[in-house]
Amino acid sequence: MARYIFITGGVVSSLGKGLASAALGALLQSRGYKVRLRKLDPYLNLDPGTMSPYQHGEVFVTDDGAETDLDLGHYERFTGRPATKADNITTGRIYQDILTKERRGDYLGATIQVIPHVTNAIKEFILDSNDAYDFVLCEIGGTVGDIEGLPFFEAIRQIKNDLPRGEAIYVHLTLLPYIPSAGELKTKPTQHSVKELRSIGIQPDILLCRTDREIPKEERRKLGLFCNVRESAVIEARDVDNIYAVPEAYHAAGLDDEVLAAFGIAPKAEPDMISWNVINERIRNPEGQVTIAIVGKYTGMKDAYKSLSEALSHGGIANKVKVNLDWIESEVFENEDPAPFLEHVNGILVPGGFGQRGAEGKIRAAQFARERNVPYFGICFGMQMAVIEAARNLAGIAAANSTEFGPTKEPLVGLMTEWLRGNEREQRSHAGDLGGTMRLGAYPAMLQRGSRVSEVYGGALEISERHRHRYEVNTAYKDRLEQHGLRFSGLSPDGVLPEIVEYEDHPWFIGVQFHPELKSRPFEPHPLFASFVQAAVVQSRLV
């Protein structure tokens, strides 16, 4: 039977509950336990698929096509266990399911209320299909005190009472701010946060205290006394130099030992931290460095590209180099020459995005990379813009454009009206809803024998990658573009949808319709990112 660990947050948002959950899961996993991580989001959206990247950050897509919170990316990267649509739920989804049942008459005329109907739905989600795991870690989004989070806190309060004694614990992540004028860490915000939790019936078992310095023994004692936890359960969560040092830091602070003690479990053995030690050694002592320009639309919000920046870091780990990121707003290139911004970089990456804003800037970035022989990696929208650039400047199709931006005489990129999903054919139109209507999840692609991308994948001729797009390169232009050197080296199994393009006479120029960053891990860097960074290393030696 699985045991449950509920991770809550207090004082301020963005403290790192997702990283804390992922790191704790990795520590338990390294001790030989099977873990599952789930995220409960209190917002009313059905999923983050249509939310602004500036508000929510990245949308993380799973193999089974769920659009989820970016924290699931942390879970996958730290534990290696692929997340599914069953690992993320929102208030909006819960309400939709409840109201659908109410319309069908499933509740037999009962009055639908937050308690018990909403809380029961949350409990069912948390407790479902966990028999194969030793620990289930559930992160509650937001902070204690948020109105929209109250049903979730009530649900996890009930779960601890419903389960046998010792089968569930609460870990509360909080902030210990340092006040320079007073010269001390302040515990009062944490005390008030715990007071708020206790007022709704939840007593934390462990306090995980974010701080930039060591917690003095007296402050640790005070926290234990006023928050009603053991002094040993006041865990110091010190700031670290990179996120992959978090498991090491939490283990050194005794978090995993304290969790097992809270369950009354004798530790099986010390966790196997060798792989984490190797990764952090490479990060802290690189043998060189490269600079990659990310030319995107949402560069003001780094979390919009969370998996992307982490995948580039993984590429650096694979090549034992530090990857410096130069974030450039693509709109800049619509009015200015890209050369002054890009001449110093060793690689250019144009990521995914939606809409016309900044598109011409991405096209100019692709042109610069092609003409200057700078390694170029185009992902999703970045591949589409590279194809439009080739059509305009190599194939002489001056009007080449995407129907996403409006009607065009030369639709190099157009809306996918239908595609196969398993054994079913899905169809879309311009008039349809935006939410949940993209080509989502893992799809296969066939690679051309002898192509660069096949070589990158170790000679593979078939791959599976995650997608999130509703527009696709038009295969009607394939022959004309290939005559000018742009090779369509990857296609869907039916040959209809272009998946990968590349230039054979370029040091490294690859565009992919999928999102390889979603499957990259620190221990298993995605081959495309490892190869891209390797090409950037070669380019850096030529400058």
Curated annotation (Swiss-Prot):
Sequence positions that bind Mg(2+): 71, 139
Function: Catalyzes the ATP-dependent amination of UTP to CTP with either L-glutamine or ammonia as the source of nitrogen. Regulates intracellular CTP levels through interactions with the four ribonucleotide triphosphates.
Reactions listed under catalytic activity: UTP + L-glutamine + ATP + H2O = CTP + L-glutamate + ADP + phosphate + 2 H(+); L-glutamine + H2O = L-glutamate + NH4(+); UTP + NH4(+) + ATP = CTP + ADP + phosphate + 2 H(+)
Miscellaneous comment: CTPSs have evolved a hybrid strategy for distinguishing between UTP and CTP. The overlapping regions of the product feedback inhibitory and substrate sites recognize a common feature in both compounds, the triphosphate moiety. To differentiate isosteric substrate and product pyrimidine rings, an additional pocket far from the expected kinase/ligase catalytic site, specifically recognizes the cytosine and ribose portions of the product inhibitor.
Stated name of the protein: CTP synthase
Residues that hold ATP according to the record: 14-19, 71, 238-240
Enzyme Commission number(s) of this protein: 6.3.4.2
GO molecular function, one term: metal ion binding
